[in-house]
Amino acid sequence: MTRYRGRFAPSPTGPLHFGSLVGALASWLDARAWGGAWLVRIEDIDGPRTVPGAAEDMLATLRGFGFIADEPPVWQSARVAHYEAALARLTAAGLVYPCGCSRKEIADSLRAAHERHTTLAYPGTCRTGLHGKPARAWRLRVPDGAAAVVAFDDRWQRAQTQNLATEVGDFVLKRADGQWAYQLAVVVDDGDANITHVVRGADLLDSTARQIYLQRCLGLPTPRYLHVPVVLDANGEKLSKQTGAAALDPAAPLPALAAAARHLGLALDGAACASLDAFQAAAIAAWDARFGPNARG
C-alpha cells in the first residue's frame, strides 16, 4: 500500500486566518490519523497577488499552532520549469490550443448562452484557430459526450459528478497575463510530490473534476479527495483575506484550534484544550473515528 502523503497549500496573499486554520487542521489531522506525511506548499505562482514576506509569516504561524511539515516547504514560483514541461507534453499530444478571446468576448458569449438557456461553458471559439487574433491564453481541450463526465467519491461531500463539456468547457492552463493557471500548477505539484490524499475547503470542490481530467491527460495518479465545509462570515460569504478576515495569533493557538475543531464537527471535551499536546491527541482520535483507518461506519 502506498504511504499516505497529504499537503496544506496556502497562497501568500496575506496572513493566515481562521478559514485557513480549518484547512490546515483538517489536512494535518488526516495525515496524522493515517500515520502519513504532511507537507506544506506555498502557492505563490500568481505573482501580482503575492505579498512579500507573507509566506514566511504563514510558516511561522503554522509552527505556533503546532503544524510542522514533515519535509521542507515547496514554493510554486521555483517550479515554473515543471509547468512548462507539462504544457509542452499536452501540446505535443494535441490536447492544448492557443486562445485569443478577451475576457469581454468570453463574458458576452456566456451571457448570450444564458439568454438562450443553453450551456454556460466556454464555447470553444478558438478550437479551430485564432481567426486572426493574437494568442492570449492556452486551453486544454475537453472531450464531448460520455468522456467529458468525471465522477469521483469525496470523503466528506460523497458522490460527485461534473460534465466538463457542458459545465466548464476547454479550460485555461496558462493565462493571458503569462501566469500559470491554478489547475495546471496544482496537478503537476501534487503529482511530483506523490500526494495521495488532498484535504481542502469545499470552495475548491468545483475544480476537482478538471484536476482529475488533467491528471489523466498527464498520466498521473488521482489522489483521494476530502472537501471540508468553508467558513462563512457574518454576511454568509466565504471568510477570506479579501473580506477582512482577522489574522491568527500564534501566541494563543488553543481557542482558535478548539473553534476550528468544532467547525469540523469534532466533539472534544474541556480537557482537550488544556495544552497543545492534549488538543492534538484528542483531535487526532476524533478525526480518526470519522475519517481515519478506525472510522466507525
Curated annotation (Swiss-Prot):
Q: Where does Zn(2+) bind?
A: 99, 101, 122, 126
Quote the record's binding site residues for ATP: 241
- What range does the record give for the signal peptide? none
Pinpoint motif 'KMSKS' region by residue range.
238-242
Name the enzyme group at the top EC level. ligase
- Pfam families membership: tRNA-synt_1c
The cofactor binding remark recorded in the entry reads: Binds 1 zinc ion per subunit.
- UniProt entry keywords in alphabetical sequence: Aminoacyl-tRNA synthetase, ATP-binding, Ligase, Metal-binding, Nucleotide-binding, Zinc
Q: Which GO terms describe its biological process?
A: glutamyl-tRNA aminoacylation; tRNA modification
Q: What is this protein called?
A: Glutamyl-Q tRNA(Asp) synthetase
The source organism is Burkholderia mallei (strain ATCC 23344)
* Lineage of source species: Bacteria, Pseudomonadati, Pseudomonadota, Betaproteobacteria, Burkholderiales
From the UniProt record, report the name of the gene that encodes this protein.
gluQ
